[in-house]
Amino acid sequence: MITYTKPLSKLIGHFEKFPGIGPRTAQRLALFILKQPESTIRDFSKALLEAHNNVGRCKKCFNLTSEDECEICRNTERNQKLICVVSETKDLLALERAREFKGVYHVIGGLISPMDSVGPELLEIRSLVERVSKSEIDEIILALTPSVEGDTTSLYIGKLLSPFTKVTRIAYGLPMGSELEYVDEVTLARALEGRTKLN
């Protein structure tokens, strides 16, 4: 077993808490940080604190923003009557990379998962229903991960929203359990084009 000096071990431990970062990558990142000049480390620390203190949730769609409303919600060129429902901001970013979707989003903040004690009340589903019921919405597109949790959440939302508007779900050319953020832009664009009606 490798023994690190205490400050280095602590730094590696922090990096290991990041999603998708294993011990080797954490070690590589920590060693890279130690090679940087103090000014770079100060700038990095400042950027971390600034992002942590100033980035919150859009009051309308719950995307990340430093304003009351995110850039997408404020953009008058986007179709405000077309809402794409995603689990996390990372999924929104994946769809934006595909450059196919011209509407707005609603980030629910996870998926219904009874095994993990995540019920609909812990997600931004009630706010979505309120948003749809108070506006003239042409279509809701559900772009949730193709998994048991994603299917459960889609069916639950579809049932709640179908009295108000058309609800569709994007088509998938990927295996069950795949994360949207790892899907290439062409596949995502085709998935949006080939969406099917849920209600």
UniProtKB/Swiss-Prot annotation:
Residues 81-175 form the Toprim domain. One of its GO terms (biological process) is DNA recombination. SMART domains: TOPRIM (SM00493). It comes from Prochlorococcus marinus (strain AS9601). This is Recombination protein RecR. Belongs to the RecR family. InterPro entries: DNA_Rcmb_RecR, Rcmb_RecR, Rcmb_RecR_Znf, TOPRIM_dom, TOPRIM_RecR. May play a role in DNA repair. It seems to be involved in an RecBC-independent recombinational process of DNA repair. It may act with RecF and RecO. Keywords: DNA damage, DNA recombination, DNA repair, Metal-binding, Zinc, Zinc-finger. GO terms for molecular function: DNA binding; zinc ion binding. PANTHER family: RECOMBINATION PROTEIN RECR (PTHR30446:SF0).
